[in-house]
Amino acid sequence: MKNLLDYTLSELEAILSPKFRAKQIYEWIYKKNAENFDEMLNLPKDMRTNLAQEFYFDPLYCVKFEESSDGSIKYLFALKDGNTIESVLLPMKEVEVDEGGNISRHARYTICVSSQVGCKMGCLFCLTAKGGLKRNLSPGEIVGQILWIKKTNHIPYERRVNVVYMGMGEPLDNLANVAKAIQILKEPDGLAISPRRQTVSTSGLGAQIKKLGEMDLGVLLAISLHAVTNELRSKLMPVNKAYNIEAVMDAVRGFPIDMRKRVMFEYLVIRGMNDSVKDAKTLVKLLHGIKAKVNLIYFNPHEGSEYGRPELADMLEFQEYLRAHGVTCTIRQSKGLDISAACGQLKQRSQNLSPSNNNTSKPSDIKKSES
């Protein structure tokens, strides 16, 4: 059987007759949260039967989750082949001011999705890398994470959702499928998530950054930098031996970005390694001429990690130096400190799970992880 979520609307129109049925199916899946083909009552019964024999649109289900006191939720999903991946829901508040000056606050959601089962980049601070790469996710398996999280958290269709390709795996190592997922997600008759609300995060595959730019998808770009010298970055991130800092910066300078947007540089701050004012000075020089925003991230220690969480004073001093020298800089609000927040943690803690391939779980059936 084939995963219906792997298909763009135009692809579905090409294989269905009459083709307007494709839009109806898209609306049932992405707007009306249908659980099966039998619910699609405006389709002929024989068509529903045939579709059910050829397609499925439930490529994953949740076998465990952890909910933090700050509202963030981390999910462990099982795929049809028994492999598992992680996704995270980050709820936040968005403040809006209307023409009359009235202030309102609305829920805003960011969903962090995986693009691969495992990862081959080998970053020393990442748990996922320790297991290596098993396989790429299909477009539908990527889309399925967002669909499942939106559905089970009752996020209204019209509510703004941001998507970040920052979970397990290197998105640009699975560029074709990630690009197709971006196209499926932006479909107006589907989830209608604008590319401007989708961010692709990469460890710095220079050639693939160029290819992504040439696709002109309109997405935002985030670079996992984490160090300002090639010596340290090569130690932390072996990919730097193939694409060093200078090569990454060259690729970024050629990436098409909306005039109102900036390239995000993720900088994981590790105590005593990359948290000094000297590092901040070097970073300012590296970013010269780039419309950049730096996001400082507290290292989130995992069991067996040799690295430590930085001090708040050091984070603030680093941030202040960047701001004083014209670089937009934020400190990412730590989420999920009381759960398995680091990439790969929940999966590691759940190695003994034996999920069924039958996607029958409902929100009430999900096993909440005991911290």
From Swiss-Prot:
Signal peptide: none annotated. Residues 105-338 form the Radical SAM core domain. It comes from the Bacteria. The keyword Transport does not apply. The keyword Methyltransferase applies. InterPro entries: Aldolase_TIM, Methyltransferase_A, RlmN_N, RNA_MTrfase_RlmN, rRNA_lsu_MTrfase_RlmN/Cfr, rSAM. It is an enzyme of class 2 (transferase). Disulfide bonds join 112-343. [4Fe-4S] cluster binds at residues 119, 123, 126. GO terms for cellular component: cytoplasm. Binds 1 [4Fe-4S] cluster. The cluster is coordinated with 3 cysteines and an exchangeable S-adenosyl-L-methionine. Residues 348-371 are annotated as: Disordered. Its cofactor is [4Fe-4S] cluster. Keywords: 4Fe-4S, Cytoplasm, Disulfide bond, Iron, Iron-sulfur, Metal-binding, Methyltransferase, rRNA processing, S-adenosyl-L-methionine, Transferase, tRNA processing. Its EC number is 2.1.1.192. HAMAP family: RNA_methyltr_RlmN. Belongs to the radical SAM superfamily. RlmN family. Reaction proceeds by a ping-pong mechanism involving intermediate methylation of a conserved cysteine residue. NCBIfam families: rRNA_mod_RlmN (TIGR00048). Specifically methylates position 2 of adenine 2503 in 23S rRNA and position 2 of adenine 37 in tRNAs. m2A2503 modification seems to play a crucial role in the proofreading step occurring at the peptidyl transferase center and thus would serve to optimize ribosomal fidelity. This is Dual-specificity RNA methyltransferase RlmN. The gene is rlmN.
